[in-house]
Design a protein with these regions (language model features):
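GST-like domain detector, emphasizing the conserved glutathione-binding G-site
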Residues: 1-174, 181
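GST-like fold's C-terminal all-alpha helical module
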Residues: 2-5, 122, 131, 142-246
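Phosphate-coordinating loops and pocket residues in cytosolic domains that bind phosphorylated ligands
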Residues: 91, 246, 255
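Residue-level recognition of oxygen-bearing side chains
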Residues: 117, 236, 249
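C-terminal helix/juxtamembrane-tail motif
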Residues: 250-263
Length: 263
């Protein structure tokens, strides 16, 4: 039983503990001056191969597979060292999260942040991997936004308390494992009736969801989390996961060679 007592007004502790405790602060904004490099390709991507980060590289590789001029320079943002709080990065994404992207293909560079928005921006810019039919397009967006709403319970909830927290808290792990299992069961039931998450065609919704839930189904997010959640029992999810994992563009998106920002 915890002896923690709620204060009337919360104040940030001097030491948080855990994997990210030293970086977390209750304020936003740049913490230091830093100039990010820019290459010659149309898209400048500042990211890391996390579940959110790989969405952008997979999407860009899928576009290239479709014959689109979607060349990009990918720069490694070392979030464990705080690169996301540098002034140039914050100018692209004031929320200090990866991935962040600059589209410099036009007269004026356009900043794009939030991984799902990067998917949507690129899909709309090139007219690929999103339907034009209103009903089908809405179904894709249903699932794209489902992922953005559901994944924080998986990552910030289950993943944090299962893998990153400085101590194992039974209530917290049970609470978020329950929700993670519910989400996996939902996807498994949906994929029992159709080849892709939004219907007959592969779309940005599949990229968004696979990057979290497909990787979890492969047990490639947190060590042994897939075993803990018994992901093998979700047969339809597993089949979909394997089908997408075998796509050449997905494989390339996972094997990107990142440039260093301080090289």
């Amino acid at each position: 039983m915890s002896d923690y007592q709620l204060p009337e007004v919360w104040e940030a502790p001097s030491q948080m503990g855990g994997a990210w405790g030293g970086l977390n602060q209750p304020t936003a904004g740049a913490r230091f001056e830093q100039t990010l490099p820019k290459g010659d390709q149309p898209f400048q991507l500042y990211t890391l191969p996390t579940p959110n980060g790989i969405k952008a590289t997979i999407m860009l590789e899928e576009l290239k597979e479709l014959g689109v001029d979607a060349g990009y320079d990918a720069y490694r943002i070392k979030i464990g060292e705080g690169d996301q709080f540098g002034s140039d990065f914050v100018a692209i994404n004031p929320n200090s999260k990866i991935p962040a992207m600059l589209d410099q293909s036009g007269d004026q560079a356009i900043r794009v942040f939030e991984s799902a928005n990067i998917l949507l921006y690129l899909a709309e810019k090139f007219g690929k991997l999103i339907p034009t039919d209103p009903a089908k397009r809405t179904e894709v967006l249903n699932w794209l936004f489902w992922q953005t709403g559901a994944a924080p319970f998986l990552g910030g909830g289950f993943g944090h308390f299962f893998h990153y927290a400085p101590e194992k808290i039974e209530y917290a792990i049970n609470r978020f494992a329950m929700e993670a299992k519910r989400q996996l069961d939902l996807l498994d039931k949906e994929l029992a009736t159709k080849p892709y998450i939004a219907g007959d065609d592969y779309t940005i919704a599949d990229i968004a969801i696979w990057s979290w839930y497909g990787r979890l189904a492969q047990d490639k997010v947190w060590d042994r989390a897939g075993i803990f959640l018994n992901v093998k029992e979700y047969k339809h999810l597993q089949a979909w996961t394997e089908k997408i994992a075998n796509r050449p563009a997905v494989q390339r998106g996972l094997e990107v060679e990142y440039k260093e920002i301080d090289a």
